UniProtKB/Swiss-Prot annotation:
Task of the protein: General activator of RNA polymerase III transcription. Factor exclusively required for RNA polymerase III transcription of genes with promoter elements upstream of the initiation sites. Contributes to the regulation of gene expression; functions as activator in the absence of oxidative stress. Down-regulates expression of target genes in response to oxidative stress. Overexpression protects cells against apoptosis in response to oxidative stress.
Major location category of this protein: nucleus
Name of the coding gene: brf2
Protein name stated in the entry: Transcription factor IIIB 50 kDa subunit
Modified residues (Cysteine sulfenic acid (-SOH)): C373
Source superkingdom: Eukaryota
Family, as annotated: Belongs to the TFIIB family.
Length: 423
């Protein structure tokens, strides 16, 4: 080959070792003279453009392993709930959008799996599919609070519009979890599925009219309503069975009642209390005979005349309230009673005021059925004083002895104590 540079015409062409490949390079202009390269001349090098590494390898980039595991978990959930292929694809697309969002890039793997469940839950809500968030959280082994926070963050980050599912459709799917068909349990316990759904939905409408359903999670109230409806369909034979016994008879899933027994019992007592208030307004029943353990025998009549009984109960309560107010105003020691009530309600912030009664002129006294936030008083926050620990506190002998375990340490401590006492 010629020893002259084709760019500048210089004859100062030397051999240069580049790693394991030898090249001929011009010393004057620096161009590569040897063949076999993409660019061999200085003019070609001047017109070239640098390409970033991530751009050159974008076509061959593999998806992240966390994204792949999230997709597999999402598709497994879709198969469990038997979603259609279109809903499954929509859930996968939504999960991919959420996964690449900056708010979800640096979260843990467990939270990314919860994010996949939240994406499927949102698609189910859009298609009016009756799926509970608690059921998805149970399958993902996630806390309800944690799943709720991630779902709220998902809707805020992607500007998603949440849709509400009809409570009757949710109730139907909930009632089918109880195995109460004639071929599954004894005849005493069996009930038609549609009849149970109708009775439970009527009880839920009553709960909504009396503010029991307001601001509450649906699971505990659903279970309490199903239990009361099951008892009311054959009260004489089923009154002796408790709520937990009913769950075992119906083979209800454990996630429905095991973790929230206290909440379910509270909703059950509230529902029975409302039924007792309305049952006392029935003209053929003596009010003294109405009790919470026997009111299920009157559920059919109460639900049949629900609207009329609600009006009668409110009217009788307002009438009794007017009579009590007139009797109080007729007393001569009215001012003393007001001052005593005010002094009773003034309690220090560190004490619970659950037993404190509201003053007579409070608006909550004028209504029979109230929302839960009005019926129950809020617990006052206890501001604990911070512990002032400086590290210079004296340590008692009993506390020192509690840290000693072996006999050798006791002997060493006794010797050291004797030496200290000598000085």
């Amino acid at each position: 080959m010629s020893k002259n540079c084709p760019e500048c015409g210089s004859s100062r062409v030397v051999e240069d070792d580049l790693y394991s490949q030898k090249q001929w390079v011009c010393e004057d202009c620096g161009s590569v003279v040897s063949e076999g390269l993409l660019t061999t001349t200085l003019s070609e090098e001047s017109h070239s453009r640098a390409v970033p590494f991530f751009t050159s390898t974008a076509a061959f980039k593999k998806p992240c392993r966390n994204l792949v595991s999230g997709f597999s978990r999402l598709r497994a959930l879709c198969r469990i709930f038997r979603l259609s292929s279109s809903m499954e694809d929509a859930s996968a697309n939504l999960f991919e959008r959420a996964y690449n969002h900056p708010n979800f890039l640096h979260i843990s793997l467990s939270k990314k799996q919860i994010l996949a469940g939240c994406c499927m839950f949102h698609i189910c809500r859009q298609n009016s599919w009756p799926v509970f968030m608690g059921t998805i959280g149970y399958l993902l082994d996630a806390d309800n609070y944690q799943m709720g926070t991630i779902y709220q963050e998902l809707t805020k980050s992607l500007n998603l519009q949440t849709t509400q599912v009809c409570i009757t459709r949710m109730l139907e799917s909930f009632c089918y979890d109880f195995k109460l068909a004639p071929d599954e349990v004894e005849e005493v316990f069996s009930v038609a599925q549609q009849r149970l759904v109708d009775q439970t939905s009527a009880l839920l409408e009553l709960a909504a009219d009396t503010w029991i359903l307001t601001g509450r999670r649906p699971f505990p109230l659903f279970l309490a309503a199903v239990y009361v409806a099951w008892q009311s369909l054959n009260p004489l034979a089923r009154m002796k069975y408790s709520l937990m016994k009913f769950c075992k008879i119906a083979k209800a899933p454990e996630q429905l009642w095991c973790k929230s027994k206290d909440t379910i019992n509270k909703r059950l007592n509230e529902l029975l209390e409302v039924l007792c208030k309305l049952g006392r307004e029935l003209p053929w029943v003596r009010p003294t005979d109405i009790q919470m353990n026997t009111v299920t025998t009157l559920v059919e009549d109460i639900l049949k005349h629900r609207k009329a009984l609600l009006i009668l109960a409110v009217k009788h309560y307002e009438k009794q309230l007017e009579e009590t107010q007139t009797s109080q105003y007729s007393e001569s020691e009215l001012s003393d009673s007001k001052s005593s009530v005010q002094t009773q309600c003034k309690s220090p912030p560190d004490e619970e005021d659950e037993g404190c009664e509201l003053p007579p002129d409070h608006w909550g006294k004028r209504h029979l059925f109230l929302p839960p936030c009005v019926r129950t008083q809020k617990r006052q926050k206890i501001n604990e004083a911070p512990l002032e620990v400086t590290g210079d506190e004296d340590i008692s002998d009993s506390e020192i002895e509690s840290y000693i375990r072996s006999e050798e340490e006791i002997k060493l401590f006794a010797k050291a104590r004797k030496k200290i006492c000598k000085y």
